[in-house]
Amino acid sequence: MFGGKGGMGNLMKQAQQMQDRMQKMQEEIANMEVTGESGAGLVKVTITGSHSVRRVEIDPSLMEEDEKEMLEDLIAAAFNDASRRIEETQKEKMASVTGGMQMPPGFKMPF
């Protein structure tokens, strides 16, 4: 059923190796930073792999009072862009660890 002698042991060894690689990848992802932009780069938000905001950069041209609402919208859009980018990066990195192995629908990695 498991490929003969030692098949189950080999399967368990492979599962442990994958678990170790996934843990290492999760740590790497948590430490990485991704920057999202909006307004053609007027607002930039940098977040970590755990979605914590590290830095917000605002072009000085947006610092006028009548630009407040637009600035707020641009910050939200930049954060959403950074969040989308980090999720894409996480999926790519985890796919490299799982070797393209299909995960069950709705399965979320523990991070």
Swiss-Prot record:
Its main location: cytoplasm. It is found in: Cytoplasm, Nucleoid. Gene3D superfamilies: Nucleoid-associated protein YbaB-like domain. It holds the Pfam family YbaB_DNA_bd. One of its GO terms (molecular function) is DNA binding. It comes from the Bacteria. Coiled coil: none annotated. InterPro entries: YbaB-like_sf, YbaB/EbfC. Keywords: Cytoplasm, DNA-binding. Residues 1-23, 89-111 are annotated as: Disordered. GO terms for cellular component: bacterial nucleoid; cytosol. Binds to DNA and alters its conformation. May be involved in regulation of gene expression, nucleoid organization and DNA protection. Belongs to the YbaB/EbfC family. Homodimer. This is Nucleoid-associated protein VF_1686. It comes from Aliivibrio fischeri (strain ATCC 700601 / ES114) (Vibrio fischeri).
